[in-house]
Each structure stands twice: as structure tokens, then as C-alpha cells.
């Protein structure tokens, strides 16, 4: 029993140490050139204009509640604010920090009250899609990686816990038969984004 506890503690420490901030750690910057706050809320907006707007949720397939993470078809729509949180005890988020992502508050029908808001990867029918789900999820975490040193352009990646060589996959867009722009794992076709501070419309 003691050996099992010791091994578990060893894994936690090893994971934490591997992500400790270093002198070369690069903070993820928003559109104001400010570093993203750990636990802060931001809009995630596409760099390429004319191909959709911010990130929101929708119902796909036989879903009654909006459980599929999608890109708004309206390029003027900023979508829903996203909360980015790292388990590391850091004030700001740096590139490649392990992250959980969830939606801030948004209105749903009464039937869907209490539905999950945290992002997860769900694999069904050969497609690994970003969903709001508590079951049938792939264990792992999200990262933010920079794609341009000249601009504050980034991509999201997902790193499966069981992946060989810590291989992570890009988050991209797949347009389904209904024209819905779904966020999915995509090989070498990332959705390139920028992060804008969330400001409530009632503020």
C-alpha cells in the first residue's frame, strides 16, 4: 500500500516539475499584449476572417442539449467567453502549460440546466470532437502553442494521456453535413486564433 502511494506522489511531482516556469517560458498574450491570467475569461477569435467567428455550443446529431463545441458561422459573433485554467500554481498562463477549458455562463433551456461546461474530447464513429461531456471522454489536457512570433497568433492542441512520445494533436474545424463548424482533433490543420479579454455586455 505504501509503495502505491509513493508511486502516485512521484508521478504528481514529476508532472509538476516538468511544467515549472523557467526563464525561457513564454507567456500566452492576448490582443492587448497582456499575458493570459490563470482562471481568466477570454474570447477565442479566429485569425482568418470570413470563415466564422468565436466559439460557442450547438446541438448536433440526436443531442437535445447543446453539447458540441463549435465555431459561430457569423464572423462578427465573438461567441461565448472561455475560462482557461492550469493546475499549476501560476498567475499567468505560458505556452504548453496543461489546461482545462470551460465556457463561462450562457443561457440554456430549463431542461439543460446543470449540463457540463468543461471541454472534453469524445471519440465516436471515428471522429474525435470537442464536447461538453462527462462520459466516454479521452483522458488528457489542452495546451496553447504559438504559431507566429510576429503576431499573437496561437493554436490549441490536445495531449492524450496515453499518447506515445507525448504527441499532441491540433484542434481544427470540421464542417458537417448540416454546415456546423465543429471543433475536432485535426492533423496539421489547426484553427489559428487570438485571445481577447472578455467583457460582459452588462458591464
UniProtKB/Swiss-Prot annotation:
Keyword field contains Disulfide bond: yes
The intrachain disulfides are: 65-112, 159-168
| First and last residue of the signal peptide | 1-25
Entry comment describing in which tissues the protein is expressed: Seed, and at low levels in leaf, root, and stem.
Quote the InterPro entries the UniProt record gives.
Answer: Kunitz_inhibitor_STI-like_sf, Prot_inh_Kunz-lg
Give TM segment ranges.
none
Keyword Disulfide bond set for record: yes
GO-annotated molecular function: serine-type endopeptidase inhibitor activity
Similarity-based family: Belongs to the protease inhibitor I3 (leguminous Kunitz-type inhibitor) family.
Q: What is this protein called?
A: Kunitz-type trypsin inhibitor KTI1
